[in-house]
Swiss-Prot record:
Keywords: Repeat. It comes from Homo sapiens (Human). Coiled coil: none annotated. SMART domains: TUDOR (SM00333). PROSITE patterns: TUDOR. Residues 59-117, 289-347, 531-589, 799-856, 1011-1070, 1342-1401, 1574-1633, 1780-1838 form the Tudor domain. InterPro entries: SNase_OB-fold_sf, Tudor, Tudor_domain_containing, Tudor_TDRD15_rpt1, Tudor_TDRD15_rpt2, Tudor_TDRD15_rpt3, Tudor_TDRD15_rpt4, Tudor_TDRD15_rpt5. The keyword Repeat applies. PANTHER family: FI02030P-RELATED, TUDOR DOMAIN CONTAINING PROTEIN. Residues 1490-1510 are annotated as: Disordered. The keyword Repeat applies. It comes from the Eukaryota. This is Tudor domain-containing protein 15. Residues 1491-1504 have a biased composition (Basic and acidic residues).
Length: 1934
């Protein structure tokens, strides 16, 4: 049956979305939905009919309908065949949306009557929506996936083959556009895209013509009139030309519409004017389009108005409009259709119809190629169109499309930019038309609305007043201590504004009149500046008033040019055709705008607020002012302003201060001239006022002098009123105020801002509700203070006076600082302020504190756990005994390393300030720990604090923001790009709730009064809008004024007390909802000096906007470092571009560059590069964590320098002239250049800062060629670039990147090339070698060490970038090729200058070393074997590098090759002992300090004679294991003495201990015996134990006369007397491994001598808490089962059965294990089995004696518990991240046929499949790679349960023949393991490898049976073999 046999009869459809298929690179979003209006009963009846209808088993082909039988239920369903392989069919169930795979007998032919009812499930594509870029963003993917389950309304545009609907949903489209997730595409173009992307079995049918009521409106005459008008407006394009275009609409490849890219700004301009006009008049009545075909204007879905032609009326109240500037049609509501004004009709069309020329070509390949480019253009890519010919009859341009990568387009692009815009009418005419379209005040409103133009200031003028452009233009100057009549030309803020003095007023008016008179007569394509470059003088049309002004070009930005208006000071970004050549007669007048700053004031905030700027503008704009010049720095004047027109002497500075918009600061003497120190502010209250009228009259009546020396201004020593000199120090941090009266508490205290993250240790603990912490960073300060206190009070006894708060008292025998709390008779209660302990002592035991001991803050700050959790079954802040113990265990187990996050400040009665905190260890947090233990639960906001508690601050929340996550944010307040506040988009509901509750609170009749003495949190009115917001109030010096901080927005304000309200207890939400303002900074701009102009631009453009933020870092104060994106605009990068234009960063670089006389263009090139590669950069950052590399397009520009963009890349070049000694001068130099040397430098290095240096000269662009020529003639004096001058490659930490190792010296010195830079490297080499011949014609260079050059590589005679490493004899140099890493010796004749354009490419060979290797060791320590092994692992292979940290110039990397960690492979390599000894940083060795001689060990020392070894010849002793106080370790008792000292070995060191045994075994075979003479006390040696008969590392304790010595076995913890003949020399090879026996002493041993505990723990694993190191022994606490030893002994009075693993020992240990980390991979826990112990169990997965798994009976209880946990898991678990799809990762997996989750571990990964191991059963299986979405993250509780199956190998035997087991042996082995009552005896245990076991059944050993049967043989290390050998020896004595 044909798939199109039934078509629904509906157009408008209601659907419930059931499934979404949306992939990042699949631009079509597909869905499944169920129609809401379907009748369930009809489908129920149909299903019954299907079951009873006879089935015809004919052959069914692909895409045909059929009936299919389900295997499980046996029911037949309707379906369609999707795939057929042999007799297996994949069938889509059309009524359920599922796919089924069945065999041929389960398929039947479709019966016609059964398929009359449409499919119940609708399959379709969301129409008319495409991604913004090349693929969908993660945010867009989440949005579409969120649509599942939502009911939507839309209409079907078309029905494709296979019943696929094109479904347009207006709601989804509008939301996607609003969230900037996608872009709108017209219906015709979208259908064409679908047709080209989707492969259908037949041609796609036309759009279904569902007939709606239509009304014919026009006649042929009207249509002809319109066509006549359109023909007149049609643009004329030259045949044979090539234009840059984008496709705006398309019906087919034979009919589509294009727009020229160069017309884009004009189209935007027209659209903006029309939108402005029609939005203004939209409310008014206007003529409707009442005749068919009339030209009209309509508002499209994006809110903009466009010109169109009315095509058709559609019900209900809609009109189909064809938009003439786009070529597409759209249905528009009739209310948004207006009559097109005559003014807008005359503007030419911006689209033109096209057809592909190739469609008529017989060349099939050409057609395919053109269609592929056409498809790219349809998807939004800009292409080039070559106009082949024009068909007048069809009115079509036939074109050939070309991509931007095409090599011919370097010429085409030149034709595009700089040529005239071929329109039938001039731009000036368009401008006049647009300017006349105002309705009332539309034009004035338009000027304010067009603020999208970027405005910033550049420092473009020379310090000597010469502008380096085509003509020497002098700049007006003002002199210090002079006064001028002036006018303000432009205001950015009071610190940055531009003035024009009255001196040149007439000349300026005259020249402006002539400029506009001349340029207004020019056509749009006339007088265009053909080759615009930064620094060129021009005449530019200002975009707001369309008038021309003198300007200078600051930056080229695509088709737009940024200019700075020299007579006004402002800037603009305008199209290139609005930049005209400036005639010489207009260059005679100097540049008039001078930058000024108002003296003595600065903003109340970090930035000037809009209100302050507006107030300043009101005072100074549009009026004459008296300008008093106080000082000058660079080109900026510091001035005072008084109004000329006011009746009184009005000082602007005083007015700004009195209005509260500014604050006062004193003059810095080094900034101003000396005479200025006598200056002060003009004050209206002063007795000696300046008579401004006299000053003005002198200025106006006297001769036209350039300045006026106002002696009165100097003599009048005026001062600022004291009331205005506000101390701002109190307002910097709202949380620095003390709680109580300052006089009552003499100690300084820490008061932290909520959100602060601190590294602390707990110093005092009274419970979760009261504990004290100390800052770790202050521990050394406290230690020093304590030493000083002990020294002082050991010889002084200052008497304490009653009534003093501060004192000192003894605690634990030491004097400590204390404070008196209360006095009771002769005793006082004190608190030790540095520790938090409280104690009652006698007054006579106190001493007075010396004032110098008060300088350090109180180190203990009081805390209680965050109020968002509360005790279980208790009141708030009341905790159970269990909670007390649990939190203490958490603190104790943290090993002293705790992170404290401040969430809020709270006052607890009577006046104690507490910090509400959460503590975090490296594994978990206290909150989670207590909740997991059942000691706490979440609190709701329905309750407030008890009456004894009150909030001192609002609450902080991290909002679960993760590093690397992406958030939608709204900027709520901006100080600068380095400090601003954001609100999260997902918190909108909370903000709305806060607003609602505040409104309700304000409307209360009896609201509580605000009491400033008791509270800080309040509701405050905001002055500018009169509304109330949550705030934090800080008192000021004024009793009635408060500084308030609006916690949900981030800004501050000074308000009166009457504007504050307390928060009522009825609204706890206002207290407990976290502060919504999140403090942020732009990540890579924090330490950059950002001018106020750029900060203002940032504020004007993005305040209140919805932006996308990527979180990169979090500072200790909670501030987030982020990257901001506005749609596709990368804001961080844009600000860097603005900084480049402003020049500030290069001024800062100038000092460093001059000091070193080196080029440092790093910053400039970086910003220039990033500005051009912004899209590439953003794409990488958003979609993948891989490093960003240099754009390949830049290499194209280097290879094709004629490309117009190549000159945009080159920064403006200036040259700095410096003296050169005479003996270096060459006579060939031109006379004008004698005695100078040429230093390429940044354009803004124009200051003379060094004493004795000649003034800097700036060379114009026209002189650069001569300079380059001079450089080649005299290369010896050139200061060349260094490696640091290259842009830094963008590398992201912890990101896995594909790459190749390009050069290897050793594991600590190699180079990496990133795979994504592969083509860049090749093309860079091509570009370099394209210039080779030209370079070789020049003279060779004589560089210095560190210079960047081009050098010829002898291997291929090609040239590459290189850096000089060494200067060698014979005119040779050692160079390193920086993009590859290898070095070579090159003669000076093969070394050339590196051209400037190649400095923009970062170093592509990344210098690296292997993580775990000492990066700064000399290369000589690496032997050839190690280097060869490392090379064999990575050479010519793809590696995955994880960049961890940069050390100097080397990157520390973790490298994966062949799915294995390279460093781990090196460690496993047995021949790498030297590597392990001196290069690899084993974790245990890391803690040891390097001793002298570590790297001086020589080979062959063991060859010395026996008696030559003396103890003083040993290079160093065996180190001790190092621990931190509070460190917790699992351990096993080794030996216990009666003195209480015992030795333990750490569980974590089992691998080290086993490796040590191997090393000792090898060592004793080659080491010589010691003689009695060579043995001394303290000598470390090898000794053979009489108990174990093995060799051990030992230390000699005593020598005895009978040739015996007492030795201490340092790895066993026991003493033995051994004969001298059992001692051997201990070499240095194994001396660096720390002692494995750790000496300990139980802290309660002295008090518990009656307890004999040595027998209890001889073989048990325990936890040791290291407390104090004293007398060469660690005092420790012992924990068993998370209980202190004393508690354990009290509870466990019944002996535990030793041969059984206890469930409690495992299950209750779960919570003490390390939780899963989001950044690391953790495997399931392995149980610690004891060797030689027997366990009962069963075998699970059995292959052969070398590969089988077992389960033990002891695990059966755990298995039940595990099964219960797995059964309770939800379906919606987090999917395992892509980066964890590697071998060793733990996860969960569920079979489709089962309902049970299984714990699995990834064993193997390939591109096609994954091998998973069921860790609880031992079986392994494969899944397809596409099923990784079914792998889920393991919850922490399940991760900590031990695995229940263990892989094993049968101990002591090998196959009888060969390396593999025979089939007979395998069958015998499997049969034996199938028997019941098996016993497994563990022989050797190695964590996470196979266990070696004996298998016993009824006392029969399986290994012996296999050997006896001839199926196996004993291995060399088999104990069975030893037993046989011993027996044979006994039978045959020698």
């Amino acid at each position: 049956m044909d798939s199109t046999s039934f078509l629904p009869t509906f157009l408008d459809v209601d659907l419930t979305i059931s499934h979404i298929k949306c992939l990042p690179k699949d631009i079509l979003v597909k869905f499944q939905g169920i129609k809401s209006n379907e009748c369930e009963f009809d489908y129920h009846v149909l299903q019954r009919e299907i079951q009873h209808t006879p089935k015809v088993k004919n052959n069914v082909e692909i895409d045909e309908f059929c009936l299919v039988e389900e295997r499980v239920s046996g029911e037949w369903q309707r379906g369609r065949v999707m795939e057929k392989k042999n007799e297996l069919y994949t069938v889509l169930l059309i009524d359920r949306g599922e796919e089924l795979r069945v065999a041929g007998p389960q398929i039947a032919s479709a019966c016609g009557n059964l398929f009359e009812l449409p499919p119940r499930v609708v399959f379709g594509i969301f129409a008319n929506i495409l991604p913004v870029g090349e693929k969908w963003s993660p945010k867009a993917l989440n949005y579409f996936k969120s649509l599942v389950g939502i009911q939507v309304k839309g209409y079907v545009q078309a029905i494709l083959p296979l019943q696929m609907f094109l479904f347009e949903v207006p709601k989804i489209i509008s939301q996607a556009l609003e969230l900037q997730l996608g872009r709108l595409v017209d219906g015709d173009s979208f259908r064409l895209i679908v047709e080209m992307l989707e492969e259908f079995p037949q041609q796609m049918p036309d759009l279904l013509q569902h007939k709606r009521p239509e009304l014919s409106l026009g006649n042929k005459d009207t249509s002809l009139d319109i066509q006549h008008v359109l023909d007149k407006l049609q643009p004329s394009l030259s045949v044979g030309s090539t234009e840059s275009v984008k496709v705006s609409s398309a019906l087919s490849p034979s009919k589509f519409y294009c727009q020229l890219i160069k017309w884009t700004p004009e189209l935007e301009n027209l659209t903006a004017h029309m939108t402005l006009h029609y939005d203004t008049v939209c409310q008014e009545t206007s003529p409707t389009c009442d005749n068919f075909g009339l030209l009209c204007v309509a508002r499209r879905r994006n809110g903009q108005w466009h010109r169109g032609i009315l095509q058709q009326l559609l019900p209900p109240n809609q009109v189909k409009i064809w938009f003439m500037d786009y070529g597409s049609s759209e249905a528009i509501p009739s209310i948004y259709v207006k009559k097109l004004k005559q003014d807008f009709i005359l503007v030419p069309l911006f689209s033109f119809p096209c057809s592909l020329t190739c469609l008529h070509s017989p060349d099939r390949d050409a057609r395919i190629f053109q269609l592929s480019i056409f498809k790219q253009a349809l998807l939004g890519q800009v292409v080039y169109a070559h106009i082949d010919w024009f068909n007048k009859d069809e009115c079509l341009y036939y074109v050939t499309l070309q991509t931007q990568e095409s090599t011919v387009n370097s010429k085409c692009l030149l034709k595009t930019v700089g040529t005239q815009v071929l329109c039938p009418m001039s731009d000036s005419k368009i401008s006049n038309i647009l300017s006349e379209t105002s309705v009332s005040d539309v034009n004035s409103f338009a000027v304010e609305s067009f603020m999208g133009n970027i405005e910033w200031s550049i420092d473009s003028l020379n310090k000597k007043g010469i502008l380096k452009v085509g003509f020497p233009i002098k700049t007006v100057q003002m002199e210090i201590e002079a006064a001028y009549i002036a006018f303000i030309a432009y205001v950015l803020n009071p610190s940055n504004f531009w003035v024009r003095t009255n001196d040149h007023r007439n000349e300026f008016q005259e020249i402006m009149k002539n400029i506009n008179k001349f340029y207004d007569l020019c056509e749009n394509d006339e007088m265009i500046l053909r080759k615009p470059e930064p620094g060129l003088f021009c005449c530019a049309r200002y975009s707001k008033d369309r008038r021309f002004y003198r300007a200078v070009i600051t930056e080229i930005n695509g088709y737009k040019i940024n200019v700075y208006f020299l007579d006004y000071g402002n800037t603009d970004s305008i199209p290139f055709f609005d930049v005209k050549i400036l005639l010489p007669e207009f260059c005679e007048l100097p540049a008039l705008a001078m930058c000024c700053s108002l003296a003595h004031i600065f903003p109340v905030e970090d930035l000037w607020t809009k209100a302050a700027i507006d107030y300043f503008k009101k005072l100074v704009l549009n009026k004459a002012i008296l300008l008093q010049v106080i000082a000058k720095k660079d080109d900026k004047y510091t001035v005072n302003i008084q109004s000329v027109e006011a009746s009184e002497n009005i000082d602007v500075i005083s007015l700004m201060l009195q209005a509260g918009y500014a604050e006062y600061f004193q003059v810095e003497l080094e900034y101003f001239p000396k005479s200025v120190s006598e200056y002060s502010m003009l004050n209206s209250e002063s007795k000696n006022k300046v008579n401004i009228k006299k000053v003005i009259s002198a200025l106006l009546e006297g001769p036209k002098s350039k300045k006026y020396h106002s002696n009165n201004l100097v003599e009048n020593n005026l001062s600022l009123p004291k009331s205005l000199a506000v101390n701002i120090s109190e307002f910097k941090n709202p949380f620095t105020l003390s709680v109580g009266p300052e006089s009552s508490w003499p100690y300084k205290e820490y008061i932290f801002r909520p959100g602060t993250v601190l590294e602390v240790k707990c110093s005092c603990y009274y419970g979760p509700g009261d504990f004290s912490c100390q800052l770790q960073c202050k521990s050394e300060d406290l230690k020093l203070l304590m030493e000083q206190i002990q020294n002082y009070y050991s010889i002084h006894s200052d008497p304490y006076e009653i009534g003093q708060t501060a004192c000192v008292a003894k605690y634990s025998g030491k004097w400590c600082r204390a404070a008196v709390l209360t006095q009771v008779s002769k005793e006082v209660d004190i608190v030790f302020v540095d520790y938090g302990y409280q104690k009652r002592v006698l007054i006579e035991d106190l001493c007075a504190i010396n004032p110098r001991f008060l300088l350090l803050e109180s180190q203990a700050f009081r805390c209680c756990l965050n109020h968002f959790i509360e005790p279980v079954s208790c009141k708030l802040f009341s905790w159970t005994r269990k909670a007390f113990r649990d939190l203490w265990n958490f603190i104790s187990s943290s090993r002293g390393l705790l992170t404290c996050i401040i969430y809020a400040l709270v006052i607890i009665h009577p006046n104690h300030l507490y910090n509400l905190v959460d503590l975090q260890s490296s594994f978990t947090s206290a909150k989670e720990f207590l909740m997991n233990r059942g000691s706490a639960q979440y609190i709701t906001l329905s309750e407030t604090f008890p009456s004894l508690f009150s909030l001192y601050s609002y609450c902080y929340s991290s909002f679960n923001i993760q590093i690397g996550s992406e958030e939608e944010v709204y900027i709520s307040h901006i100080y600068s790009p380095q400090k601003f506040y954001c609100q999260l988009g997902r918190n909108n509901k909370d903000l709305e709730m806060i607003e609602t509750k505040i409104t309700e609170s304000v409307n209360l009749q009896n609201f509580p009064k605000y009491d400033s003495n008791k509270m800080r949190v309040c509701i405050s009115k905001y002055v500018e809008d009169g509304l109330s917001y949550r705030a934090l109030a800080i008192p000021t010096d004024s009793s009635s004024e408060f500084q308030v901080y609006f916690v949900d927005f981030g800004n501050k304000q000074l308000v009166g007390e009457n504007m504050l309200r307390a928060i009522s207890a009825q609204f706890p939400e206002l207290l407990f909802t976290p502060m919504q303002a999140i403090k942020c900074f732009l990540s890579d701009l924090r330490d950059v000096d950002i001018p106020a102009e750029i900060s203002s631009w940032f504020k004007d453009n993005f305040l209140g906007r919805s932006l996308k933020a990527i979180i990169l870092s979090q500072e200790s104060d909670g501030q987030l470092g982020i990257e901001l994106y506005d749609g596709s605009q990368y804001i961080n990068e844009k600000i860097k571009v603005l900084l480049h234009a402003y020049g500030k960063r290069h001024c800062d670089q100038a000092c460093c560059m001059e000091k070193s006389n080196k080029i440092n263009e790093n910053k400039r090139f970086t910003t220039s590069l990033k500005g051009k590669t912004g899209n590439n950069y953003r794409h990488n950052v958003i979609n993948k964590p891989s490093p960003v590399t240099y754009s390949e397009r830049k290499i194209d520009q280097l290879m094709h320098p004629k490309n117009i963009h190549a000159r945009f890349l080159k920064p403006s070049v200036c040259y700095k002239m410096e003296p050169v000694s005479k003996n270096k001068m060459k006579t060939s130099l031109n006379d004008g250049l004698k005695g100078i040397k040429i230093v390429p430098g940044a354009a803004h290095i124009l200051e003379n800062r060094r004493v004795g240096q000649k003034s800097v000269k700036v060379v114009s662009q026209s002189f650069i060629r001569a300079l380059n020529q001079t450089t080649s003639q005299n290369p010896y004096d050139l200061i060349r670039p260094q490696i640091k001058d290259l842009p830094q490659p963008q590398i992201y930490l912890n990101a896995k990147v594909k790459g190749y190792v390009s050069n290897i010296s050793n594991p600590a010195n190699f180079h990496i090339q990133l795979a994504e830079n592969e083509s860049v490297i090749i093309r860079l080499a091509d570009a370099l070698n394209a210039t080779a011949r030209r370079l070789r014609e020049r003279k060779s260079v004589k560089p210095l060490v560190g210079d960047l050059v081009v050098a010829e590589y002898s291997g291929d005679n090609a040239i590459y970038r290189a850096v000089i490493k060494k200067i060698l004899p014979g005119n040779s140099f050692e160079v390193e090729f920086i993009d590859y890493g290898n070095s070579a010796i090159v003669n000076t004749s093969k070394i050339y200058e590196l051209q400037r354009e190649f400095l923009t490419v970062p170093q592509l060979g990344i210098h690296a070393f292997l993580s775990g290797v000492k990066w700064n060791e000399p290369d000589e320590i690496w032997d050839d074997k190690t280097v060869d092994y490392f090379t064999s692992k990575v050479h010519n292979k793809t590696v995955y590098c994880e960049f961890l940290k940069k050390h100097d110039q080397k990157w520390e990397v973790n490298m994966i090759c062949d799915e294995k960690c390279v460093i781990n492979e090196l460690l496993k390599w047995k021949a790498c002992s030297k590597l392990q000894k001196s290069a690899l940083q084993m974790p245990q060795v890391l803690s040891q300090k390097v001793r002298p001689g570590d790297n001086e060990m020589k080979k062959g020392k063991s060859n010395e004679s026996e008696g030559s070894m003396n103890s003083n010849q040993q290079l160093f002793k065996i180190p001790l294991e190092e621990f931190k106080l509070g460190q917790l370790e699992k351990a096993e008792m080794l030996n216990v003495s009666k003195s209480g000292r015992f030795y333990v070995k750490l569980s974590k060191n089992k691998k080290i201990l086993s490796d040590l045994i191997v090393l000792i075994t090898k060592e004793e075979k080659k080491s010589p015996f010691l003689s009695m003479e060579s043995i001394e006390k303290g000598l470390e040696c090898l000794a053979k134990s009489k108990n174990t008969l093995k060799w051990h590392r030992s230390k000699v304790e005593e020598k005895y006369v009978d040739d015996k010595v007492l030795v201490f076995l340092v790895d066993c913890g026991i003493y033995e007397i051994v004969p001298v003949c059992n001692t051997k020399l201990l070499s240095n090879e194994i001396r660096n491994i720390p002692r494995q026996a750790v000496p300990c002493k139980w802290i309660w041993f002295e008090n518990s001598k009656n307890i004999s505990f040595e027998c209890l723990f001889a073989d048990l694993e325990i936890n040791i808490l290291f407390l104090k190191y004293l007398d060469a022994v660690w005092e420790v606490e012992i924990l068993v089962d998370d209980l202190l030893l004393l508690e354990y002994l009290n509870l466990n009075t019944v002996p535990v059965e030793e041969n059984k693993l206890r469930l409690a020992e495992i299950v209750y240990n779960i919570e003490s294990k390390t939780p899963v980390s989001s950044c690391t991979i953790k495997s399931f826990t392995w149980v610690q089995f004891q060797n030689d112990r027997q366990y009962s169990g069963i075998a699970t997965a059995v292959s052969d004696p070398s590969d089988f798994s077992i389960q033990l009976e002891d695990f059966f209880d755990i298995m039940k518990y595990l099964f219960m946990l797995l059964s309770d898991l939800p379906e919606t678990l987090q999917t395992l991240p892509q980066e964890f799809i590697i071998p060793g990762s733990s996860c969960l997996f569920k079979y489709k046929s089962e309902d049970q989750w299984n714990r699995v571990e990834i064993s193997e990964v390939s591109p096609q499949s994954l091998c998973l191991v069921l860790v609880d059963y031992g079986f392994s299986f494969y899944i397809r790679y596409s099923e990784i979405i079914n792998l889920k993250v393991v919850p922490e509780e399940l991760l900590n349960l031990p695995r229940l199956s263990y892989p094993c190998i049968l101990y002591g035997i090998l196959p009888a023949k060969g390396k593999h087991w025979s089939e007979e042996a395998k069958i015998f082995f499997r049969d034996f393991l199938s028997k019941p009552d098996l016993v497994f005896q563990f022989r050797e245990y190695h964590s996470e490898t196979k266990l070696k076991v004996d298998v016993i059944h009824e006392k029969n050993n399986l290994a012996d049976i296999l050997v006896a049967s001839g199926l196996a043989t004993y291995s060399k290390d088999s104990p069975h073999l030893d037993a046989i050998t011993a027996t044979e020896s006994a039978k045959n004595p020698i």
